[in-house]
């Protein structure tokens, strides 16, 4: 038997040893039957393999790394603990409050009216009557007199302040706040305005705002009534402030934890993406090639030299059928050898190429175009490629993408050689390769 066929048979047997499921291939049923006829025992489960499984290559064994590439890489992130929403507790407060009064707003004075001396005197008389009614406990009557006084003299902050204090006695905090605001618009330093508004806000349970107004009133004109109200208001205001700070802190801590979880998740996702890319890169670099020069030229020389170089005198016309196969190792290698072949040397040779290219390298390439200019004698087909493989300068140049692109361009169209002659990186490589191909002169 031919030594080549024996070598191929040995490779096939080694493949079957490493992966017995190869015997399930329908086209090998005759071989399986032959083995069983000799008494061989086919491993259990081999016959039960799924018939739809794609036959595996006899040349390149599929590796587990290829399968891993299809698996989704999931970052290992700690499960986020779902935290309950923060629910604020009730604050136990002391002091009585009243329901807000929703009566229509009381009559206010017209600040655009010019106040005469007579109006001022009449306003003072109305104020005096209001004080008398107030001392007798006639609050509604006091409100009527003070409203008349405000109408006569709408520029008096005291009139608004007095009416606000009466509304407080009537437990009408909203009306009191309106009068207090009017008094403070006229006189921002009105102690009675701050005092009345602070007491009204305390009645509505607005403890923090009430404390602020009462402190301002006490600063302007301190009295015992303000101090007494503050003693009731301040404890509640402090409790509410502590309560607010507590839950502000809890919310801040919750937001910080969430931000930290998000940061860790993004970091884990980025790490997982990096690990996946690195694994794919390692897998692609370690995956064996189906042929080509060892150490190889990425992507090979695609398609070889289309149509071959024109036939010349001498050499073997049409190239050697079958050509030289790859020598294992270059990713992608010279696919199928250099397709198209380089039959019978270049007619006249390319510039700087002595005597043309060697006879066809490639898997049964197409014969070159007949005829052409007579060459100076074709080169023998059995060129020693070790001269290229053992040349460190050429092998280093092959790893340069720019050089490889130029070589591929020349291989596709030899006429493009001229445009690369001026490239200081490419021209020396092409010249050196021409010298290797030319052989002894």
UniProtKB/Swiss-Prot annotation:
Stretches that traverse the bilayer: none
Coiled-coil region list: 236-285
PROSITE patterns: TPR, TPR_REGION
Domain of life (superkingdom): Eukaryota
One Gene Ontology molecular-function label: protein dimerization activity
Positions with biased composition (Gly residues): 289-314
The family this protein is said to belong to: Belongs to the FAM10 family.
Identification of the protein by name: FAM10 family protein At4g22670
């Amino acid at each position: 038997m031919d030594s080549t066929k024996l070598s191929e048979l040995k490779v096939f047997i080694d493949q079957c040893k490493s992966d017995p499921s190869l015997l399930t291939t329908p086209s090998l049923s005759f071989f399986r039957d032959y083995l069983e006829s000799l008494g061989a025992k086919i491993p259990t489960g081999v016959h039960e393999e799924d018939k739809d499984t794609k036959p595996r290559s006899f040349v390149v064994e599929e590796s587990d790394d290829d399968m891993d590439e299809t698996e989704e890489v999931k970052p290992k992130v700690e499960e986020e603990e779902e935290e309950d929403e923060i629910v604020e507790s009730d604050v136990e407060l002391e002091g009585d409050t009243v329901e807000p009064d929703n009566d229509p707003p009381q009559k206010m004075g017209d600040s655009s009216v010019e106040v005469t001396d007579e109006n001022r005197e009449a306003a003072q008389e109305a104020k005096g009557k209001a004080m008398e009614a107030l001392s007798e406990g006639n609050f509604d009557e006091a409100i009527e007199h003070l409203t008349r006084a405000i109408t006569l003299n709408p520029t008096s902050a005291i009139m608004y302040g007095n009416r606000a204090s009466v509304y407080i006695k009537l437990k009408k905090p909203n009306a009191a706040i309106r009068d207090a605001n009017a008094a403070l618009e006229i006189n921002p330093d009105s102690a009675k305005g701050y005092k009345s508004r602070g007491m009204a806000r305390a009645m509505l349970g607005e403890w923090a705002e009430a404390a602020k107004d009462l402190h301002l009133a006490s600063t302007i004109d301190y009295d015992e009534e303000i101090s007494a109200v503050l003693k009731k208001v301040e404890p509640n205001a402090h409790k509410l402030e502590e309560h607010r700070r507590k839950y502000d802190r809890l919310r801040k801590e919750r937001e910080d934890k969430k931000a930290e979880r998000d940061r860790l998740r993004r970091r884990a996702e980025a790490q997982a993406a990096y690990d996946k890319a690195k694994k794919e890169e390692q897998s692609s670099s370690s995956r064996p090639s189906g042929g080509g020069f060892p150490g190889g030229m990425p992507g090979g020389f695609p398609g070889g030299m289309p149509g071959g170089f024109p036939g010349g005198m001498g050499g073997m016309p049409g190239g050697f059928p079958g050509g030289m196969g790859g020598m294992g190792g270059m990713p992608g290698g010279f696919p199928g050898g250099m397709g198209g072949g380089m039959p019978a040397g270049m007619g006249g040779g390319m510039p700087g190429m002595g005597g043309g290219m060697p006879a066809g390298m490639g898997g049964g390439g197409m014969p070159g175009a007949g005829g052409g200019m007579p060459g100076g004698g074709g080169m023998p087909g059995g060129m020693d490629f070790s001269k290229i493989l053992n040349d460190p300068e050429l092998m280093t140049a092959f790893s340069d993408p720019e050089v490889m692109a130029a070589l591929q361009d020349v291989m596709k169209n030899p006429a493009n050689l001229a445009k690369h002659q001026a490239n200081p990186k490419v021209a020396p490589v092409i010249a050196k390769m021409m010298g290797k191909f030319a052989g002894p002169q």
